[in-house]
Design a protein with these regions (language model features):
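A donor-sugar binding/catalytic signature common to diverse glycosyltransferases
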Residues: 109-112, 264-304
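A short, glycine/small-residue-rich beta-strand->loop->alpha-helix junction that serves as a flexible
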Residues: 7-19
Length: 307
């Protein structure tokens, strides 16, 4: 079977899922004919993804939430204005997707939470069936309980999630809890997509805390906390575009640019893990029985709570 991937390219989560599923498919005799990655101007496509993906990669401009001025939270107003201005470009991206789906020769399109894929299937109804995969599809499950706070944000996230899966024949919701499938919505609950490397590296208990911050602006908070706790050894991964591979603040605080293999090495040897978001990294830490601290953020925390 020939498969075409369309991936939402923000952060490392969906990209890591795509790499994992690509290997699973090829190991079982299938082929991934291409990977189309939707991205904004705010982030770069990580080098680890470019290096490890076997199928040819192409990118297109996609709507995404912009960070706030401090690069700590979602800038909702900025995001709305920016995406309205960019809407003509998004129409070009929709045509790009339609043409590639039609000409790919694929038997199946797998959509990793890319909103323009849903819009493309809604507008043009491509003949190639679409399957959507992501932990966010748990939001659609009737038994899934969201927190009581931030109701408006929840409604926006659920609406966004529904748009990503327009026209899908099947939705696969990743979860580390067991739920019954919802056949009415064609929603199946499946385990997280863990990379083989995440399960094969031996676990050792080091003397440092590992962290991952989705928005680089939170590095200021990490540094402030570190000044009050200078004896605790910290290693944090971030996605700051202009950063060196390793940024050493002092003897006990180091920031690392996102690198999947390097991250797994540090995860295997940490004594605890702290993060502002990232479902996949939380799953990998849970697999290794690491103590985990999840810092709630507007929008980000919705992606990992109670899954």
């Amino acid at each position: 079977m020939k498969v075409l991937f369309v991936v939402q390219g923000e952060g490392r989560g969906h990209l890591t899922q795509a790499l994992t599923l690509e290997k699973m498919l090829t190991d079982n005799g299938h082929s991934v004919v291409g990977i189309l990655v939707g991205k904004s101007c705010a982030r770069e496509l990580p080098e680890f993804f470019i290096d490890r993906a076997q199928a040819p990669i192409q990118t297109f401009l996609s709507p995404n939430f912009l960070p706030s001025k401090t690069n700590k939270h979602i800038g909702l107003t900025r995001s709305i204005i920016y995406n309205i201005i960019k809407s003509p470009n998004y129409m070009s991206s929709i045509h790009f997707l339609k043409n590639h789906i039609d000409k790919s020769g694929a038997d199946l399109v797998i959509n990793f939470y890319e909103v323009l894929t849903g819009i493309t299937y809604y507008l043009y109804q491509p003949q190639v069936p679409e399957v959507c995969i992501g932990h966010q599809y748990m939001f659609l499950h009737p038994e899934y309980q969201l927190p009581e706070e931030h109701k408006f944000s929840q409604q926006l996230m659920i609406a966004f999630t529904k748009v990503t899966c327009l026209g899908a024949k099947k939705k696969l919701a990743l979860s580390f809890h067991k739920y019954e499938d919802d056949n009415i919505q064609n929603l199946s609950i499946v385990p997280p997509l863990l990379r083989s490397e995440a399960t094969s590296i031996p676990r050792h208990h080091g003397d440092y805390v590992l962290g991952y911050i989705l928005n680089a602006g939170f590095s200021e908070n990490v540094i402030e906390w570190h000044k009050r706790n200078p004896k605790l050894n910290l290693h944090f991964f971030w996605d700051r575009k202009d950063a060196e591979e390793t940024t050493i603040i002092d003897e006990t605080l180091t920031f690392h640019r996102i690198d999947d293999k390097k991250f797994l090495h540090y995860l295997a040897n940490c004594k605890a893990y702290a993060t502002t978001g990232g479902f996949e990294s939380v799953c990998e830490a849970m697999y290794r029985y690491c103590p985990i601290k999840v810092c709630k953020l507007l929008f980000s925390y919705l992606c990992i709570c109670k899954l």
